[in-house]
């Protein structure tokens, strides 16, 4: 989720432009949509963590706590959105979604810590740091790629989707190779038995 988050935040404009930048979907529409996508990007790691942390409760046959936290997230989301929609506009919706989801993650961590159900060892921390490093490397290459192919990704270019696909494929490969070299990704774990 970390590389996905960085990718959305860095390349949101190019992604929306490549997918929807045709016909009646104007450059202004692209800018507005890409801004929303960028703010959703901040919440991507939280969305993934919510899924993982809720399973820790489900595995103990506790479905009430995740339900309560889900309600809490929805209420916070609605509260923030309604409070600031008039002053900020539609962009508050992805912002509120990301903020409320991160607050939900914090609640999960507090409850798991309180119940002594959260165990984070040194190996896990090392792997997280390695993933962060690989994601930063990927993001750097992505920034470079978007800069080099800036003209090819222009709104008027009919083949912009192909160029974006090439860039995304390349940076994804860089990320996977980095994870493999750092020992996070092990091929033996994916061998078909």
Predicted regions and their residues:
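Membrane-embedded alpha-helical bundles of multi-pass transporters/translocases
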Residues: 1-193
